[in-house]
């Protein structure tokens, strides 16, 4: 990476850190330049304005999400995707969910991006759409697909797949948001999620 490219990335990293705490309106170009250790005028050689920095951050966040999220990659009509889920057990479901949750909570970029989206979703329509897609639409689509798949395989009882998926994943989303606000409660939340998933499989296990 060139020196200019390195500085540009440093600006984006500093911007993500500041925006995830202060939000867009409260973060100034002067603060960003100071965080990187460059003059304000120098920052403009990398980005035209603050909005350009935000746009670049949104693009980087979207690319990372598409690359790493299990929800973005789901294709329940693809045998290669479903192969390792054919004999899904409660233990497997627990590990699947907890693995994704740990990644979301502990990857610095993803964690900060989530907080930035939470702050900015009420000001920026594009961020609101991204927040809905990442935290609701894709999650519900993934778990609805999983439930339908397990019903077809005779592992779960016949019921409304979308409602079953909501019962499974939406409480987890609430607990995940709790961890964002109170990270010291992660161990408690992890135990709750495990109990929740196991009870779901007990309730809906095919007779």
Q: Where in the sequence are the language-model features?
A:
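Hydrophobic alpha-helical connector segments
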Residues: 56, 69-108, 164-165
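N-terminal intrinsically disordered/low-complexity leader segments
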Residues: 1-6, 76-77
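Hydrophobic/aromatic-rich alpha-helical bundle segments in the mid-to-C-terminal region
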Residues: 129, 133, 137, 147-198
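Hydrophobic/aromatic residues within well-ordered alpha-helical segments
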Residues: 50, 57, 61, 65, ...
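Helix-turn-helix
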Residues: 10, 18-60
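Short amphipathic alpha-helical interface segments enriched in basic and hydrophobic/aromatic residues
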Residues: 16, 20, 24, 62, ...
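Amphipathic alpha-helical packing segments from all-alpha helical-bundle domains
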Residues: 105-118, 122-152
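Alpha-helix N-cap and coil->helix boundary residues
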Residues: 27-28, 109-113, 159-163, 188
């Amino acid at each position: 990476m060139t020196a200019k490219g390195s500085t540009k990335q440093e600006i984006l990293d500093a911007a993500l850190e500041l925006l995830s705490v202060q939000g867009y309106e409260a973060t100034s170009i002067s603060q960003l330049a100071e965080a990187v250790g460059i003059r304000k005028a120098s920052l403009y050689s990398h980005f035209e304005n603050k909005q350009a920095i935000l746009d670049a951050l949104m693009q980087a966040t979207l690319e990372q999400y598409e690359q790493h999220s299990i929800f973005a990659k789901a294709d329940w009509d693809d045998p290669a995707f479903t192969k390792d889920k054919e004999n899904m057990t409660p233990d497997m479901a627990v590990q699947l969910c907890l693995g994704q949750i740990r990644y979301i909570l502990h990857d610095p970029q993803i964690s900060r991006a989530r907080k930035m989206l939470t702050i900015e979703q009420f000001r920026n329509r594009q961020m609101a759409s991204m927040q809905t897609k990442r935290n609701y639409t894709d999650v519900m689509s993934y778990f609805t697909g999983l439930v339908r798949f397990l019903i077809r395989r005779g592992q779960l009882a016949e019921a409304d797949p979308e409602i079953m998926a909501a019962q499974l994943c939406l409480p987890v989303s609430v607990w995940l948001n709790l961890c964002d606000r109170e990270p010291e409660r992660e161990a408690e939340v992890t135990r709750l999620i495990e109990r929740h998933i196991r009870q779901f499989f007990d309730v809906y296990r095919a007779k």
